[in-house]
Structure formats: structure tokens, C-alpha cells
Amino acid sequence: MTIGDNCYFNKGFTLLVHDWVTRVFIYSGREFLPSSGKVTIGNNVSTAYNVTILKGVTIGDNVFIGANSVVTKDIPSNSIAVGIPCRVIMSIDDFHAKREIQCVKEAFDYALSIQQRFKRRPIITDFREEFVLFVDGDSIEQYPEMAELIRFQLGPSYQDYVKHHKALFPSFEDFLNAAGIR
């Protein structure tokens, strides 16, 4: 088995380089036959919960495998793949473009749900992932309560974020106003 760099395997991950069919062979009066195969996982591969990868599979670089998937065949690089059996549903580029649109609506919905559920105005620390929508890279110091979280969330891309990121909304207040929070 080979596993590349920067891989993350979530809870319930199983990797099998063999199967147990040999036991069935033996107890059904058949000859023992080995059953094993190599698994190769590229760089920057992540899985959601309860993913199983079976023998003989190669997964390319920059791949995300969705929850409860069973990978029985090769998955090419730069892919999002899900299902039983696991199959590619879109490229990582297409998924990123889709998320660029969806994340704004989801952030607005989240802001409104805080207001409705807790009967209060959302505060910046409620937004542990959504900060990219309202914190420019060069304005992190304006939000000291978020600085460490932002550094943690961005990991190795932090310096690039600081140098280049321009948020969709000029400020947290502008974000809340766009979400319909007054």
C-alpha cells in the first residue's frame, strides 16, 4: 500500500488490501486461494465518514471521497467521487465553482438561523468557516477574536490568503446586511 502526502482519512475509514473470500473457499470444500492487491492513494486525498477502499484501487491526487462510499475502481486525479460503488461525480474545479455560489447562500441561511433560533444578532465568532466571505487577507488584524482560528483553518495556505484574498463583502457588517440581518 502507498499513501501520498497531505491525506486525511475521516472516522470509519477502512482500507483493505485483501478480502475474506478465502474463508468461504475453505469452509465450502474448495482450495485456499490468496486474494490480495495493492492500493495506491495519491497526494492531497481526503475522505468523509465511513469510506472503504478495496484492494487493487489507485486514487489520484487532489481527490475527495464522499461519505459511506465503497471504492472498488480507480479514481482519477482532481475528482469528487461518491457512492456504492464509488464513482466520479465531478471535477474538483467544477465542485469548487459550485461551492463558490452555494457557500454564500449557506452563510446567509446560517446567519438568519442564529437570529431566529437564539433571538440575537450573529457575532463574528459564530462564523468559523465563513470568514472568507468578509475578512480580506490584509485585514485579519481588524478581527483579533478570529485571527488564531483563521490561521488554523487555512493551515498551509494562510500566507497566500494574507497576501491575496479579497473577501466578497467589505466587512462583517456588510455581510450581515446582505444576509438580511438588521
Language model features with spans:
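Residues that scaffold the ATP/ADP-binding catalytic core of kinase and kinase-like folds
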Residues: H18, D74, K98
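Beta-rich strand-turn-strand
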Residues: N50-F64, S69-K73
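Terminal amphipathic alpha-helical/low-complexity segments used for targeting or macromolecular assembly
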Residues: C86-R182
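Flexible, glycine/small-residue-enriched loop-and-beta-strand segment within the central core
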Residues: M1-T58, I84-P85, S91-D93
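Short coil/turn segments at beta-strand junctions that form active-site/ligand-binding loops
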Residues: D5, D61, S77
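Glycine-centered loop/turn positions within well-structured domains
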Residues: S69, S77-S79, R87
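Catalytic binding pocket for nucleotide-activated donors in carbohydrate/polymer assembly enzymes
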Residues: S77, V82, D94
